[in-house]
């Protein structure tokens, strides 16, 4: 690893530890010539994953595109950036482990919706309203009814667990 200060090609690792995300190794290095210390990060190189869009075109998978959509949907909601980052990480991991080279944008959208349904209902509805491109109010009402039924089911299970 070249030193960022003097560009010398040899450095030694002073400290090595796993970064917070669990997928990266953080290394502190010291240049063997000028003794400058610097940090490097090491991560597994992942093969490109292509997303097949609804119109049939293909583009490279972008974690940032998913992140931007979720962040917009979660604006002014009690959803922390850590929660959002965890959701995005789970989605990316699921996509990369389930699909080898290509994944449909529909599959990604469904994964996002599943995650958001568990995270925050309003964020879920906001994302769904853009993702699903609702044509009329009836479609939105149907989605809200599904959410209401799911919430009632959860409350019912919780009440049953408390009484047992």
Swiss-Prot record:
This protein's name: Transcriptional repressor NrdR
UniProt key word Zinc: yes
Function: Negatively regulates transcription of bacterial ribonucleotide reductase nrd genes and operons by binding to NrdR-boxes.
InterPro entries referenced in this protein's UniProt entry, alphabetically: ATP-cone_dom, NrdR-like_N, RNR_NrdR-like
Co-factor requirement: Zn(2+)
Keyword GTP-binding attributed: no
GO BP: negative regulation of DNA-templated transcription
Family annotation (PROSITE patterns): ATP_CONE
Swiss-Prot/TrEMBL keywords: ATP-binding, DNA-binding, Metal-binding, Nucleotide-binding, Repressor, Transcription, Transcription regulation, Zinc, Zinc-finger
Cofactor-binding details, from the entry: Binds 1 zinc ion.
Family: Belongs to the NrdR family.
Gene it is expressed from: nrdR
Domain ATP-cone: 49-139
GO molecular function, one term: ATP binding
Native species: Streptococcus pyogenes serotype M1
Zn finger limits (unnamed): 3-34
